[in-house]
Amino acid sequence: MSYVDAIYNQDADKICLSERVDGKRVLLEYKPKYEFYYEDRAGKYKNIYGNSVSKIKTRSKGEFQKEVAVHRGQQLFESDINVINKCLEENYKGKDSPKLHTAFFDIETDFHSEKGFSPPSDPFNKITAISIYLDWSKQLICLAIPPKAMSMESANIIADKFENTIMFEREADMLSTFLDLVDDADILSGWNSESFDIPYVVNRITRVLSKNDTRRLCLWDRLPRKKKFEKYGAEQETFVLTGRVHLDYMLLYQKYTYQEMHSYALDAIAEYELGDKKVAYVGTLDHLYNQDFEKFIDYSRQDTLLLAKLDKKLKFLDLANEIAHANTVLLLQTMGSVAVTEQAIVNEAHERGMVVADKVKQSEGNTQAAGAYVAQPKKGIHKWVGSVDINSLYPSVIRALNMAPETIIGQIRPVSTDKYIVDKMADYRKANGRMYKGTNFAGAWEGLFGTLEYTAVIEQKQGVSVVVDWVNGDETTHTARELYEIIFNAKSNWTLS
């Protein structure tokens, strides 16, 4: 058993979670875990710095918030961790990921002779076709509305030439059938579907059926949640589904491939990855729809089939699923990197019997992070202009400076550094007899650029002895000056760490 998606229902004070068990969807509920830690010398728990902390556990979110406010003046730990991630860690850590049901889909829309194609935010044109590939049943299904000039009899003759192709007179019936078909899907995925297909479908269902019918795209009777994002410098709107997860396969492809493509159009990516292409046609898609409906159906089906073929080869949905369950995060959280990394750190700290500090809240400002120097170009025509683009800069620097890990054949033993850090962290008594608390691990390193042994070698100190542990198990003792000569002046091709 393992999870698909989850939400925190604050009003009902519960976590609603969906599982996929033996091919069946199972809906569960969990009680949220309201607890955090604060610094306390008498505490039974340890933070990542080795200091003692105490736990506070409450029964409700209201009590939790009150306790957090009471202890606000102290260093707090884990008061800001999402209750969903706490639930996933407690109940699903180490569990296998489920075999998800995925529905790949693609829509085609009508064309208005005066207004043109409609944007997803104002879908005044009807949806003319929806193709869906259900991976759990390996079925490619096409739903379509024939052109106005074509009779249903003629449309059905064309539909009979394809498997699982159904004609509709009313768009409302087609949309309702689509919702029925994807009802058992855990994931909806399309190409550029975050920007187009999902917002168009949600807004069109609202217009043709009702806003209440959009709940059928989600679980737990939830409405799709509006989300704004920026693309090409403009703000756009999409929808986040609940329980049934939407993942844009184009964004997955951009995230998990490491080469920059000249075009991220489905046609270009399919040709590059599969040697396959979309159905070619002459003229506009509107002309194809009205003049060659059979090829239009083939075109719609092929787009969705290409998506299924891409995932069969690349398995990016499986990758996202494994990453989510390895780190006890939700599938949507894998589209970023911060939430996954943070939860992985939390999980590892808990494995070691430690708790992590709350994130430091920084005030938002206009200060940008330091980056590369960017020269402002001088306008005009220039002669002899050159440009150098260094590919794989960091790996190239590592090779050029002989810094690769395989060159490390020994390690300098940090004896003096370890003692220095321990002494800094230890409690101590001053001349007045009062005891003072030592610093934490991070504070012990304040003012140090590197280990004491590293500094001694770089400064070529003659009177400092340093022990080296070699990869073959031997150990030798040298002065810091001798090691400097061995590393930098002996023309050796190896490195000491």
Annotate the PLM regions.
Residues 119-121, 199-212, 324-326, 400-407:
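Short secondary-structure boundary/capping segments
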